[in-house]
């Protein structure tokens, strides 16, 4: 089987295309003689460069993503700086914080004379989380509340709010 093609490709399923593939390989410009060619043989003088470039690009992408998650974690007000969180933990806390801010803005719009500006209303959001085996249980209630409130809030808000979308 040719290592350059997937196992399910039509050319690897029959025996006839093998001579055709060999003829195409041998007719490439720059080929001077018989010998193994393609990914399985021949000299590998230039084949390491694309792999190294791909690896460097992937390392850069992962590093950028890691820095973005750390920055997002730093913006969460209830998470102490020494807390180790997984990416899922950071995303869940960020979504619950955004939901809390959204609900606070909606509550402020409904009752602007409310004296408790910025006070947390105790809805189960913004848990300070340390690494411990049962930390996932913290999110079960918070995300469930978030999903229930956001879905019901969207249904009622679509009927009551004006369609002006500019801030």
UniProtKB/Swiss-Prot annotation:
CDD domains for this protein: bHLH_TS_TCF24
Keyword Transcription regulation carried by entry: yes
Gene Ontology MF terms: DNA-binding transcription factor activity, RNA polymerase II-specific; protein dimerization activity; RNA polymerase II transcription regulatory region sequence-specific DNA binding
SUPFAM superfamilies in the record: HLH, helix-loop-helix DNA-binding domain (SSF47459)
Domain of life: Eukaryota
Ranges of Gly residues composition bias in the record: 32-45
Subunit record text: Efficient DNA binding requires dimerization with another bHLH protein.
Record's compositionally biased regions (Low complexity): 1-23, 46-55
SMART domains, A to Z: HLH (SM00353)
PANTHER family: BASIC HELIX-LOOP-HELIX TRANSCRIPTION FACTOR, TWIST, TRANSCRIPTION FACTOR 24
Segment forming the signal sequence: none
Functional summary from the UniProt entry: Putative transcription factor.
Pfam families with a match to the protein in the record: HLH
GO-annotated cellular components: nucleus
InterPro entries according to UniProt: bHLH_dom, E-box_TF_Regulators, HLH_DNA-bd_sf
UniProt name for this protein: Transcription factor 24
Record's subcellular location: Nucleus
Region of interest: Disordered: 1-60
This protein's UniProt keywords: DNA-binding, Nucleus, Transcription, Transcription regulation
